[in-house]
């Protein structure tokens, strides 16, 4: 305190102005509080508790303590609160001791002075192990089975739509090099403006190197016109993810919009084709179940008299006719053997 009293008034005023506003006024609402947890209570504990040096170090560093040093320690403590929330959010660990260890290790890595490390560790221990809003939400709100199934189904549908959109939506880029060393990039992105319009727009991006480093680029975007006029030129097409130009017009993210941007056809044509395809498939499925009338085999039941007549007077002989010997053939040869000579 004697050193503070001996300071000139201008220097003391500069120290008071240089102190961070966190030490004098409560901080504003944290936008990351819903995800990481609220740290207001932890920061209030940091401001209320004395974060000065330990009693063993009071005689050595007591003379050098100033409002600025206290503000630095309070800032380190508040940073420890936030580091604990970040470690808990990243690790998702149910063991608070593991998160405390990670937070203290982060404090040691962030600060060099021992007093600041201790203040940061104090912030780690002051932050609650679980966010209070999340605890209240778990107690008050019971999970619903139907709602969870609905959320799962909606998440699955969104994943399928996003994967289809990522597969369908692509950008074609044309690269040309002029005589003066400039590289002209033609990038197409089909956009359907009205129901009767087919095609897309074409944007010309002129890229110029300004220096030896690849980062020194000068990009100029120039809308050229409809894409149908440029398709006549035979240019080598190369798909690339570099030098992409985002469209300023809002685009829909549904399946028909993706197919419309991909093919350049209006949405109503794609919807009609899809509807007609479904009707044709239904008609084919129903037509295969009905067989032609000529292919049916009709069996009429026989009466008792018809059955007897069918058995007694058959239309065909039951036995094959006997075979008659041919008259023109030679008589059989009779062989006589002398048994005494054998």
Swiss-Prot record:
Membrane topology: Single-pass type I membrane protein
Keyword Amino-acid biosynthesis found: no
Sugar-bearing residue positions: 97
Keywords on record: Glycoprotein, Golgi apparatus, Membrane, Signal, Transmembrane, Transmembrane helix
Subcellular locations according to the entry: Golgi apparatus membrane
Stored Pfam families: BSMAP
Motif (Microbody targeting signal): 340-342
Any Gene Ontology CC annotation: membrane
Main location (coarse class): Golgi
Tissue expression remark: Expressed preferentially at high level in the brain.
Leader sequence residues: 1-24
Function: Modulates the O-glycosylation and complex N-glycosylation steps occurring during the Golgi maturation of APP. Inhibits APP transport to the cell surface and further shedding.
Homology family: Belongs to the TMEM59 family.
Annotated protein name in UniProt: Transmembrane protein 59-like
